[in-house]
C-alpha cells in the first residue's frame, strides 16, 4: 500500500522539494509524517497546518491533495 507522500499531487511534491532547500527541518517533518501513514485521517493537525503555511494547501481541500481522482460533491 502506498503512503501519503507517494500519493501527493506532483505540484505539491515540487513545492516540498523547494521547501527542503530553504527550510530542511520543516520539510523533513512533513515528509516523515506523510511517509508514516497511508490514511489521511491519521495526519496530525500540526502537519496539516505546516503544509497550509509552507505549501499553500487549503485545509478544506486537504483530502483531495492525496486523492486527485475523487470528485468533490
PLM regions with names:
Residues 5, 35-37:
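A generic structural signal for short
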Residues 19, 23, 27-34, 62:
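Conserved hydrophobic/aromatic packing and binding residues within compact polymer-binding modules
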Residues 23-26, 43, 57:
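Alpha-helical hairpin
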Residues 1-22:
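A short, Lys/Arg-rich alpha-helix, primarily the initiator
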Residues 14-18, 47, 58:
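Residues that mark the N-terminal boundary/hinge immediately upstream of a DNA-recognition element
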Residues 34-35, 47, 66:
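DNA major-groove recognition helix of helix-turn-helix
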Residues 53, 59-73:
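Short, charged recognition helix plus adjacent turn
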Residues 38-53:
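Short, basic-rich loop-to-helix N-cap that marks the start of a DNA-contacting helix
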Amino acid at each position: 500500500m502506498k503512503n501519503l507522500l507517494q500519493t501527493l499531487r506532483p505540484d505539491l511534491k515540487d513545492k516540498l522539494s523547494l521547501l527542503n532547500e530553504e527550510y530542511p527541518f520543516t520539510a523533513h517533518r512533513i515528509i516523515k509524517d506523510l511517509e508514516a501513514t497511508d490514511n489521511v485521517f491519521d495526519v496530525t493537525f500540526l502537519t496539516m497546518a505546516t503544509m497550509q503555511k509552507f505549501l499553500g494547501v487549503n485545509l478544506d481541500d486537504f483530502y483531495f491533495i492525496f486523492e486527485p481522482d475523487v470528485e468533490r460533491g
